[in-house]
């Protein structure tokens, strides 16, 4: 049974982006969400909102900053006063979408790529229960390896959030960075799982590894599960256009945003100590989603 949408203060929702035509991509960063979103965006009648971080805005505040205060009467996002703020949250997303993507108002599809806002996915799916959800997951060891490369000195993300004159976090203390990123992975995936399990609408869970191994059939499965009609020839063209093999060589490789696209590449990238750190922290999720790798890990 699908949940009822919270009351919205915005009149004429039907003239904006239809809530049921929003497709969220949640999970964690460095999981292939840009690739997946780009394949969907390339289809006629689609647009992609690239990481609005609305999930981070509300989720980080609600789950971590407020803590137990949300159970009382004074926190603005109080648990017992959800009816007062879920509607405005809904308005924020729909209003922001309509202002930015008028080309899909009235009938098009909007893919919202929000891996780094996945901490707030339970709240967003509660605010927009008509919307569709993709739970995208990738082996945590590959996620950590990719993240370490992205934030290493001289790499594509290294200078965005810190002084470029300082050595990046993965370079200064790679083991500490691996630990931090593994813990972040657990938080993001657990919240995404919570949202996925609670969502009564259309949804699908996808492993990056399956998307990489058989892209076209996995995309077909996604559209079937989400109950979105898709033109076969257009889907095939989009998959081909965005395939790893068709990315120019100068745009991929170590230190680039598109790095390996190689499941299991962590075996070449992480030290044994880093592997042990990541596996210890993420063991329950590895056992659940990647049981076929048990022989490489031993008993966890």
Residue locations for each model-derived region?
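PAPS-dependent sulfotransferase catalytic core
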Residues: 1-96
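Residue-level signal for short amphipathic helical patches enriched in basic/charged
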Residues: 31, 43, 128, 214, ...
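Generic structural marker for isolated residues within well-ordered, non-membrane alpha-helices
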Residues: 37, 94, 98, 121, ...
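Alpha-helix-centered segments that form part of catalytic cores
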Residues: 85-110, 178-188
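PAPS-dependent sulfotransferases, especially Golgi type II membrane carbohydrate sulfotransferases
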Residues: 1-23, 148-151, 157, 174-181, ...
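PAPS-dependent sulfotransferase catalytic domain
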Residues: 62-63, 108-233, 244-255
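Short, well-ordered beta-strand elements within core beta-sheets of diverse protein domains
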Residues: 24-26, 206-211, 266-268
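A short, structured active-site edge motif that brings together acidic residues
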Residues: 51-55, 137-140, 235, 239
């Amino acid at each position: 049974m699908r949940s009822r949408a919270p009351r919205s203060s915005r009149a004429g929702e039907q003239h904006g982006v239809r809530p049921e035509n929003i497709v969220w991509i949640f999970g964690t960063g460095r999981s292939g969400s840009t690739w997946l979103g780009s394949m969907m965006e390339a289809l006629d009648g689609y647009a992609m909102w690239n990481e609005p971080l609305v999930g981070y805005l509300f989720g980080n505040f609600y789950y971590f900053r407020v803590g137990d205060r949300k159970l009382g009467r004074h926190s603005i996002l109080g648990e017992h006063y959800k009816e007062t703020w879920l509607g405005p949250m809904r308005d924020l997303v729909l209003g922001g979408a309509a202002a930015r993507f008028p080309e899909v108002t009235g009938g098009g599809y909007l893919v919202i790529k929000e891996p780094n806002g996945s901490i707030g996915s339970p709240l967003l799916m509660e605010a927009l229960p008509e919307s569709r959800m993709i739970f995208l997951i990738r082996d945590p060891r590959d996620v950590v390896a990719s993240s370490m490369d992205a934030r290493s000195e001289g790499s594509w993300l290294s200078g965005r959030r810190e002084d470029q004159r300082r050595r990046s976090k993965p370079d200064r203390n790679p083991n500490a960075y691996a630990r931090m990123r593994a813990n972040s992975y657990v938080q993001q995936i657990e919240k995404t799982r919570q949202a996925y399990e609670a969502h009564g609408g259309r949804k699908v869970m996808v492993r990056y590894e399956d998307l990489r191994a058989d892209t076209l059939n996995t995309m077909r499965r996604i559209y079937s599960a989400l109950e979105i009609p898709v033109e076969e020839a257009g889907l095939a063209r989009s998959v081909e256009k965005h395939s790893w093999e068709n990315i120019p060589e100068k745009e991929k490789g170590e230190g680039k945003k598109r790095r390996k696209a190689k499941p299991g590449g962590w075996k070449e990238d992480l030290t044994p100590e880093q592997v042990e750190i990541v596996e210890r922290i993420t063991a329950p999720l590895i056992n659940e989603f990647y049981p076929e790798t048990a022989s490489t890990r031993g008993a966890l």
